[in-house]
Design a protein with these regions (language model features):
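Soluble extracytoplasmic regions of secretory-pathway and membrane proteins
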Residues: 3-4, 17-20, 24-43, 47-891, ...
Length: 920
């Protein structure tokens, strides 16, 4: 049955009503999202950050929308004004021109029925909205451009301050792209108007245009050539990121061929623009055709083909000679971009002079050699300390504390709540959002100690936390952590689960400062809409004092406040003054540093650890401390968000003792430094001294007998650097030559104030062979006693897990230590069973670190042969003290070990003096 004309009206009205409702829902969703964000930013004290961001987005959207819509509408209205009047285009004329008759009839009937002004205005508005929506993400780019600060160094080609490349050039490129979008949309709207009105006909060939359409097209083509000239001008600066030569950055061909060609193209594009505008009167199709061929033909021949031929035929045969200055630019600016130019290089003799006396003098280092790897320790924590299935240790952090036992490196992990681990029938809305709201407590272990069963010792354990020489914790609850997905509601009528106690549970009420008040019906409705969760509105457990906690995952929390910062992958827990805090390293990065080698992320080539973020695990307060005030990017953001950042000096003194050099940054710098320690262009070109990361054997059975090994990763340790007066917390990584396994250097990053952030490379003598980690691994595998013991364990149903091999610099020598774990084939509880130590040509394996060191240095102990009978008693006494020292060392009794060495020293000196007298 055919619909009557009148029956279409209700259908049309229904369609309009549905469209209006859908539009209102979309707008309402956007508005509620903005309101919720405003409430959250206000609740944490960063309303100023919110308004700066929102106003920047709104102003940019409005400006782009207004400009885009106006220009597109102007183009459309000009076409409407000068195009043929509807009905004036006769079908017969169209037929003679070769246009299909049905198209001619359709256009002739359609044109008079179109409300042209309304259609053009509507199209301009829609296109303007789409363009503005696409450009709104550039709000950060615009603010950085407007508030930029100079870098203080200039590029070697154009002499521009590097701040121009970090802030201005990306903005200019974004502006150019917007103008091209705008021009394209303007041309499309005008073409549609002219096409429907009959000003464009499609003959075979070519396309025939009316005088108005030809003039309009010439004008737009002239604008296109102006934009193309501007694009070529910007392309000059993009040569500094070219990656077609020996290194990243402009090379000999770029400077001597491509740069002059770009100047020629700028001139040609400008001339083509003028010719196009002159052609608005002549309207000769040959002018735009010739302009396009001239500009793009020249670009193809002289910007693509000619440079490639020049590079191959002229530059390649004399590449080193011609490219040397540009290689030097790349080396200098890459080192600057990654902070490699701040690395100090010091010699390391790599001597073989360690003995028990040396170990006692470096007792702080020995006491803090890490025997527990992260994964075995996390597995052990899970078995011993998770207490209930809904608790989870998500990571293990490494830090240092001044405890009763001294300056100790520790490993610690937060016991976080994982509601998803609750039984399926217990995952109710009340449990997930009102009852199970927080984790509880921390476990902390010394890195070197173990029990007789091979399990870790604990400084902190259990719920509530019990300290055994560890720091006291007054507030162990974690409402914010590395988990913390989803919202929770606190201060309601139902008490929150705190921790299990025997057969009963202990409950608590949140008394912190975080949260958005949701006591009113309006607020509850707002959040019910935002989270699509009507329970927030319907529940009786929400009271007038209730608050909702959002963004409880610490990285999500930081990113929401400061999305322009790049976050380190490993936030770590800090215990300070009885409270728990998260420390998050944050970076400023860029991909616009000229001549710098991309080294991470999306081709980023600049990085600074500019910010240390501290998050209170209970209150959720977030503080941003500027750790690199010389970084121009963070200085720019300080101008944009003056209330967001604090100086590092404002960080509480106790928290300052726990800042550490971030491992992600160190890894990036070490990766680049493998090549960029070579500062001579010829050496760099030939890759004569390329380094690489050492290999090691880790995991079950060391990865197998034929394993090629795993690249070593940086590790923290407490040690006394050469020529330094005291021990400190450092991050180190050994280096070996490319395709070789002997060690050539080790890189250290200092973590303790006031030397925080200083990088040092300790280089070994070129004429001395120092065993590298993989060579030590080979010697361990070749040790008959060790290999037989491992085979025996495997035959008994246990799995042997090789731990990381640690290179431990002590004084001017290198000691190697590696833990060995056993795990039942069907179990998940690794036990630290043996410690392997190597020094010089010796490799030993014992049950404890003390035992391994005692066995390793037993034969190299400084024993003296008495020259006379009167010295026999001294020699026997010295030997007795030495044997007791060894026993104390095996037992881990360092105080007894030190006392025996103190008693041994004068006896050895007396024996040495007696020998000297006898030899005279």
């Amino acid at each position: 049955m055919r619909l009557q004309p009148g029956s279409r009206v209700p259908f049309k009205r229904t369609g309009i009503a549905v469209a209006v409702v859908v539009g209102c829902l979309i707008v309402a969703g956007r508005i509620t999202g903005v309101v919720v964000d405003w409430l959250w930013f206000s609740s944490i004290g960063y309303a100023g950050v919110f308004w700066t961001t929102v106003s920047a987005k709104a102003l940019l959207f409005a400006a782009v929308f207004a400009a885009s819509s106006s220009v597109i509408a102007a183009s459309g209205f000009l076409a409407h004004r000068y195009a043929r009047r509807p009905g004036s285009w006769q079908v017969e004329t169209a037929r003679l021109s070769g246009t299909p008759e049905f198209i001619s009839e359709l256009a002739d009937q359609l044109a008079p029925r179109i409300p042209w002004r309304t259609s053009i205005a509507g199209s301009a508005i829609v296109l303007g909205l789409l363009i503005a929506a696409g450009q709104i993400s550039n709000w950060d780019l615009v603010l950085r451009f407007l508030h930029q600060v100079p870098y203080g160094e200039r590029d070697p080609v154009f002499g521009q301050d590097i701040g121009f490349y970090l802030f201005s050039l990306p903005a200019y490129l974004a502006f150019k792209n917007w103008l091209l979008q705008l021009l394209s949309c303007s041309a499309i709207v005008a073409a549609v108007v002219y096409g429907v009105r009959g000003d464009i006909t499609f003959e075979r060939p070519p396309c025939r245009l009316s005088a108005a359409a030809a003039a309009h097209g010439s004008a737009l083509l002239g604008v296109f050539f102006v934009l193309k000239a501007g694009s070529y001008a910007l392309d000059r600066f993009l040569l500094l990121y070219d990656d077609n030569g020996v290194v990243v950055g402009a090379g000999y061909t770029d400077i001597h061929v491509e740069l002059p060609v770009l100047w020629v193209l700028i001139g040609l594009a400008g001339a083509a623009a003028v010719a196009s505008w002159i052609n608005m009167r002549r309207r000769d199709y040959r002018v735009p055709a010739a302009s396009l061929v001239l500009v793009f033909g020249t670009s193809f021949v002289f910007a693509l083909i000619y440079p490639a031929l020049f590079q191959r035929l002229y530059v390649k045969p004399s590449e080193l000679q011609l490219e040397t200055p540009y290689i030097q630019h790349n080396i200098a600016l890459t080192r600057m971009a990654y902070g490699l130019n701040q690395i100090a290089v010091k010699p390391f003799p790599a001597e073989q002079e360690l003995n028990l006396t040396s170990l006692e003098a470096n007792r702080a280092t020995i006491d803090n050699i890490r025997l527990w790897d992260v994964q075995p320790l996390m597995d052990t924590y899970a078995q011993l300390q998770e207490i209930r299935t809904y608790y989870k240790f998500l990571s293990v952090d490494i830090d240092r504390y001044r405890l009763e036992a001294g300056y100790r490196q520790v490993m610690l992990s937060a016991r976080e709540l994982e509601p998803s681990m609750l039984p399926a029938n217990a995952q109710t809305w009340v449990n997930l959002h009102l009852l199970f709201t927080h984790g509880n407590g921390v476990v902390m272990s010394p890195v070197t100690e173990k029990s007789t069963e091979g399990l870790p010792s604990f400084y902190l354990q259990d719920i509530p936390p019990v300290a055994h020489g560890g720091p006291a914790i007054r507030e162990p609850r974690l409402y914010f952590g590395e988990g913390g997905e989803g919202y929770v509601i606190v201060k309601g009528s139902v008490a929150e689960f705190d921790y299990p106690k025997g057969k009963d549970n202990v409950y608590t009420k949140y008394s912190g400062s975080d949260g958005i008040a949701i006591g009113s019906t309006a607020r509850r409705s707002l959040f019910a809409w935002q989270f699509d969760d009507p329970n927030i509105l319907l529940t009786d457990y929400v009271t007038s004092t209730s608050r909702i906690l959002l963004h409880r995952n610490i990285q999500d929390r930081v990113r929401t406040i400061a999305p322009f910062l790049t976050l380190d992958r490993d936030p770590y827990l800090v215990i300070s003054n009885g409270r728990l805090f998260w420390m998050q390293d944050a970076y400023t990065t860029s991909r616009w540093f000229p001549y710098a080698q991309p080294g991470f992320g999306d081709d980023a080539n600049y990085i600074r650890n500019a910010v240390k973020v501290v998050i209170d695990a209970y209150n959720g307060t977030v503080y941003f401390y500027v750790s690199d005030p010389n970084d121009p990017i963070i200085r720019t953001y300080q101008r944009i968000f003056p209330s967001l950042f604090k100086s590092l000096a404002a960080m509480p003194a106790d928290l300052q003792q726990h800042i550490r050099y971030p491992e992600d940054l160190f890894q990036i710098q070490a990766q680049l430094y493998r090549a960029y320690h070579m500062d001579a262009a010829e050496v760099f070109y030939n890759r004569e001294d390329l380094w690489q990361f050492p290999r090691e054997l880790i995991g079950i059975d060391g990865g197998g007998g034929s394993s090629p090994g795993t690249p070593m990763t940086p590790y923290y340790m407490i040690m006394r650097l050469p020529d330094e007066p005291r021990e400190e917390f450092v991050l180190i990584l050994p280096m070996v030559p490319s395709q070789r396994d002997n060690m050539i250097a080790w890189l250290a990053a200092r973590c303790d104030p006031p030397n925080y952030g200083k990088l040092i490379v300790y280089a070994f003598p070129k004429d001395k062979l120092v065993y590298g980690p993989f060579q030590i691994e080979a010697r361990i595998q070749q040790n008959t006693e060790i290999s037989q013991q491992i085979s025996l364990w495997n035959q008994m149903g246990s799995r042997v897990i090789r731990g990381h091999l640690l290179v431990v610099p002590i004084e001017n020598s290198i000691l190697y230590v590696s833990p060995l774990y056993l795990r039942a084939e069907s179990g998940q509880l690794p036990e630290l069973k043996r410690v392997i130590a190597a020094y010089g040509d010796r490799v030993v394996m014992e049950e404890t670190l003390g035992g391994a060191l005692a066995a390793l240095f037993k034969e190299s102990a400084p024993l003296a042969s008495p020259p006379q009978g009167t010295a026999d008693a001294r020699a026997r006494e010295a030997l007795a003290h030495y044997n007791r020292a060894i026993e104390r060392l095996k037992a881990g009794d360092w105080s007894g070990f030190g006392a025996e060495l103190d008693a041994l020293r004068p006896l050895l000196e007396a024996l040495g003096g007696g020998r000297s007298e006898g030899q005279k």
